[in-house]
């Protein structure tokens, strides 16, 4: 007697892979960067049945950097997808980079079937354990019913508080299983309460008074301003107070470098006059920075002549590298909005004149030669030809 064919799933049921992709759609995802493999094939097939655009990259490291760039450029959560084993481990450098740069990212990896996890199955790597220290959080999905909740939590964790990468590892059998999904509308994570601190009125009045009393104030602006979408608030502050600005590598773009008050980048690879200004300032307003060693050099010598006010959304950054006279845990956008309502119109002509002397004495310059094409010359020529409108991507080589 012929065996009866398996009954088709009930109409309301969905395959695990489709549930995951539908969860992405519900989070507003429009683009996924991925490279398919055996353990993630179900997910990629589900993508073809969705409205999400899949950008096929040549390598998993390339895909996660593409997702990171997308997140930085758009302000949205970047999403990438890879298979198990070597596919997952190829994401490691990108995850570490996103963690260091506080970039919101959700990385989804396929995994070997649940029944063979821990048995050295083909292309099995414990990617959750491998990435635990370089992600904001990670998940190993062990029930198909948990997929909608986990994806919603992953996006919430990646994009709130101090942003960062979240990894979701999905075994192949979970992708192939069926269930009736329940998509949550809200997120409730008892163990995760993202810091939404807002600077107190008293603290911001103290900052405003410090600015009023200062003779040589300086704003030290970092990537936290970009993450908080607070560039307009920073520019409003500078327009009102006329305080010079230095920027970290991660903070480039928060203030126009063509503005006379911009001292460009600070630190090892920054301008001489930006570093001189740090050393001579009597008040350093550190906004959304981490006092990175490439900026500070010897910590005991950094900004040792001035009072330091450090505002950051992550309390763990306060006093971690450099002890501040006034550390404030706050969303920088909120803090700047409050500060803009308290500061008075001011200017520091003597301080700016002193900085301009350094600027003239130590400009960014190079000597053109007929024998060689210097990198500086190539960049200068490209800038002139494109009138500054081109999007240029670079590595970090010398």
Indicate where each model-derived feature is located.
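Short beta-strand segments
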Residues: 81-83, 106-111, 142, 169-171, ...
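Glycine-rich, acidic loop regions that bind phosphate or pyrophosphate groups
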Residues: 109-150, 251-354
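Conformationally flexible catalytic loops at phosphate/diphosphate-handling active centers
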Residues: 125, 157-213, 352, 364
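Glycine-rich beta-alpha junction loops
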Residues: 37-39, 112-113, 170-176, 223-225, ...
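Anionic-ligand anchoring segments at beta-strand to alpha-helix junctions in alpha/beta enzyme folds, i.e.
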Residues: 30-68, 199-200, 206-284, 384-398
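Thiamine diphosphate
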Residues: 41-114, 273-292
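Gly-rich Lys/Arg/Thr-decorated short loops/hinges at beta-loop-alpha junctions or inter-strand turns
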Residues: 2-6, 45-50, 108, 130-136, ...
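Active-site diphosphate/adenylate-binding microenvironment
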Residues: 17-21, 35-38, 43-45, 356-398
């Amino acid at each position: 007697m012929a065996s009866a064919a398996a009954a088709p799933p009930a109409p309301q049921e969905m395959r695990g892979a489709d549930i995951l992709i539908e969860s992405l759609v519900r989070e507003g995802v429009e683009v996924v960067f991925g490279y398919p493999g055996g353990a993630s094939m179900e997910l990629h097939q589900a993508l073809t049945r969705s409205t999400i655009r899949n950008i096929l990259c040549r390598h998993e490291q390339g895909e996660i950097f593409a997702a990171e760039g997308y997140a930085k450029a758009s302000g949205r959560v970047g999403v990438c997808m890879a298979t198990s084993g070597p596919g997952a481990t190829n994401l490691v450098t990108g995850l570490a980079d996103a963690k260091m740069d506080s970039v919101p990212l959700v990385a989804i990896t396929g995994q070997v079937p649940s029944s063979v996890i821990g048995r050295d199955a083909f292309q099995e790597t414990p990617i959750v354990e491998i990435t635990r220290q370089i992600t904001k959080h990670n998940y190993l999905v062990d029930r198909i019913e948990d997929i909608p909740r986990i994806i919603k939590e992953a996006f919430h964790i990646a994009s709130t508080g101090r942003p960062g990468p979240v990894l979701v590892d999905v075994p192949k059998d979970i992708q192939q299983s069926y269930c009736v999904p329940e998509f949550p509308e809200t997120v409730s994570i008892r163990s995760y309460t993202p810091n939404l601190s807002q600077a107190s009125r008293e603290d911001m009045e103290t900052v405003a008074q410090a600015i009023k009393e200062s003779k040589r104030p300086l704003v030290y602006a970092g990537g936290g301003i970009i993450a908080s979408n607070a560039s307009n608030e920073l520019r409003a502050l500078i327009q009102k107070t006329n305080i010079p600005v230095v920027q970290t590598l991660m903070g480039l773009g928060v203030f126009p470098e063509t503005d006379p008050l911009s001292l460009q980048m600070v630190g090892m690879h920054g301008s001489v006059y930006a570093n001189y200004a740090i050393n001579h300032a009597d008040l350093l307003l550190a906004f959304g920075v981490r006092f990175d060693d490439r900026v500070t050099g010897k910590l005991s010598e950094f900004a040792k002549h001035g009072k330091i006010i450090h505002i950051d959304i992550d309390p763990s950054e306060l006093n971690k590298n450099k002890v501040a006279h006034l550390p404030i845990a706050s969303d920088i956008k909120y803090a700047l909005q409050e500060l803009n309502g308290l500061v008075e119109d001011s200017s520091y002509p003597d301080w700016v004149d002193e900085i301009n002397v350094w600027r003239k004495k130590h400009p960014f310059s190079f000597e053109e030669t007929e024998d060689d094409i210097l990198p500086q010359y190539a960049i200068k020529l490209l800038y002139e030809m494109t009138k500054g409108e081109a999007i240029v991507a670079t590595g970090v080589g010398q």
